[in-house]
Structure formats: C-alpha cells, structure tokens
Amino acid sequence: MQIKRSIEKIPGGMMLVPLFLGALCHTFSPEAGKYFGSFTNGMITGTVPILAVWFFCMGASIKLSATGTVLRKSGTLVVTKIAVAWVVAAIASRIIPEHGVEVGFFAGLSTLALVAAMDMTNGGLYASIMQQYGTKEEAGAFVLMSLESGPLMTMIILGTAGIASFEPHVFVGAVLPFLVGFALGNLDPELREFFSKAVQTLIPFFAFALGNTIDLTVIAQTGLLGILLGVAVIIVTGIPLIIADKLIGGGDGTAGIAASSSAGAAVATPVLIAEMVPAFKPMAPAATSLVATAVIVTSILVPILTSIWSRKVKARAAKIEILGTVK
C-alpha cells in the first residue's frame, strides 16, 4: 500500500491528515488518552514536548553559511512577512474584541488567529515552487524562513503590538531548544545531518497530538471563515512581499508570491501561545481550526498564482527583449 504517497498528494498532507485524525479522536472519544494512559496518552496529549524536539531538530538543520544573494532575498521576505503581521496585529487589536469575535459569521476570529496565519511562510512549499519558477539562489532563500517556525515571532509580534506581555524567561524558554540545535548543527555537520532527518518525521506526531485539542464541530463552524482567512493571507502579505522582492530583493516579484503562504507549523502556534498566556486559551481551538484551513487554502492557491505570475513576467521580459532586438 502506498499510504505515504497518497497522503502527500494532499497539500500539506503529512501535517493535515494526522491533524484531522487527531481531531476525530478528540471529537468522538475525548477521554481516550486518559483511558489508555501510558505511552498512548503521551502521543495524544504530548503536543508541547514533541514540538520541543521538533524545534531542536529544525534549528540543527539550518546551515549558517549562505551566499549574500540568498541572505538578502531570504532576509527581505522574512522581515517583510513579519512586519506585515505586526501591522495586522496592531490594527486588529483595535477592531477585534480582546477575547475574539464570539457571535455571527466572524465567530472564532481573533488577533491570535490572524497573526499565527500571517507571520510564518511555508518554507518547503516556497523552495519547491522557486525551484520550478525561480533561480537557484531564490530557491535557497528558504534558509532563514525556518527562523519563523515556532511561537517566538508570534510572541514578539503580540508583545510589541501591546496585545500580550511575556516574561523574559518565557522568551528564552521558547527559543532555547532551537538555538541549542542550531549551535550543535553548525558545530558538527554530522549532527546537522543526523538531527535534520527527524524534522519531517516528527511532523505527523505533533500534528496528531495537536489534532487532539480540536473539536470537529469548531472546524465546521469556522470552515468558510478559514477559507477567507487563507485568501486574506495571500492578498495582505503577498502584495507587500512582491513589492519588497522587486525593490529590495532584486527579483521580479515571483518569490514574493511564493512566500505568501501559511506554514503548517503555524497550526500549532495558538495552542503554544495559550500554554504561555492562559488568557488566550478560550481562543486557541477556533484559532487552530482557522489557521489549519488557511494552510490548506494557501498551499493550493499559492503555487497556482505563482505559476500565473511567473508566466506573465517572463512573457513581458521576452516581449521587451524582442522589441529591443528590433530597434
């Protein structure tokens, strides 16, 4: 049976299928973890420890050395994405109620959901798209996108926008596994190779545990809103990313569109933030569902939009070249 190959045909499948299975488990048998106990309970409820190991391995997979072009392109995209998420947070905090919207079509929408959906780029999706439509250097620009993974950037955005306050030691605790992994991976290439193999392996495990915090009725209630959130992520982050790629990154805007997705890891952010700041706990389930839907939507639309943009840019460049030759 080609189970893995079938799952991978779904955009973000290795994250979203286990997430859905976990949500099924939580919806129809919410006490399963307590009933079975031991290791089974650990797999069902172990979101934070599994993610801690994943962050460590993610840090170890990042190589410090990179060309100037790669760093400029990567830095431009990462900083722009984070800056846009900060602006969205600052505006949303003045419009959306403190505990999120509780009634009506926008029920479940919160500043936490908006920031979590917008501040992280799907690095793997970006790299695969740019390998097809961009240069080798542009494809390699995902190197710094891994720094967005995890709750740290979301914490910084929420903190600096005045939406939440975090003690300094909480910031350190959030980033420490990543930094230790990063240090070890760059001190020893063999360790980097060893730990980086676990990055993809751990995704289904933390996705399943994360799914066990979601009730499927919440997903049903936020489905259409989640689709609109996914479209909003592409528009709100995509336009500034295109402009930044052209003006600062030295590109033609293709990399900007390719970076306008939501990362699968962003699905875990609301729960992790809620663990650190209990005030966010009531919003976390709906925010998780919204972000999960946004991940699916952006994973489907971003490759299509990038393809269309790239074709138009290349056609325009070819036309200009022909006109220049004629003259």
Swiss-Prot record:
Organism: Escherichia coli O7:K1 (strain IAI39 / ExPEC)
Family: Belongs to the KdgT transporter family.
One GO CC term on file: plasma membrane
Coiled coil ranges: none
Residues spanning the membrane: 10-30, 42-62, 73-93, 95-115, 139-159, 163-183, 199-219, 224-244, 254-274, 289-309
InterPro entries hit by this protein: 2keto-3dGluconate_permease (IPR004684), 2keto-3dGluconate_permease_sub (IPR018395)
Keyword Protein transport on entry: no
Catalysed reaction, written as an equation: 2-dehydro-3-deoxy-D-gluconate(in) + H(+)(in) = 2-dehydro-3-deoxy-D-gluconate(out) + H(+)(out)
Function: Catalyzes the proton-dependent uptake of 2-keto-3-deoxygluconate (KDG) into the cell.
Upper lineage: Bacteria, Pseudomonadati, Pseudomonadota, Gammaproteobacteria, Enterobacterales
Gene Ontology terms, MF aspect: 2-keto-3-deoxygluconate:proton symporter activity
Protein name per the record: 2-keto-3-deoxygluconate permease
Location in the cell: Cell inner membrane
Bilayer disposition of the protein: Multi-pass membrane protein
Keywords on record: Cell inner membrane, Cell membrane, Membrane, Sugar transport, Symport, Transmembrane, Transmembrane helix, Transport
One Pfam family it belongs to: KdgT
Keyword Transport: yes
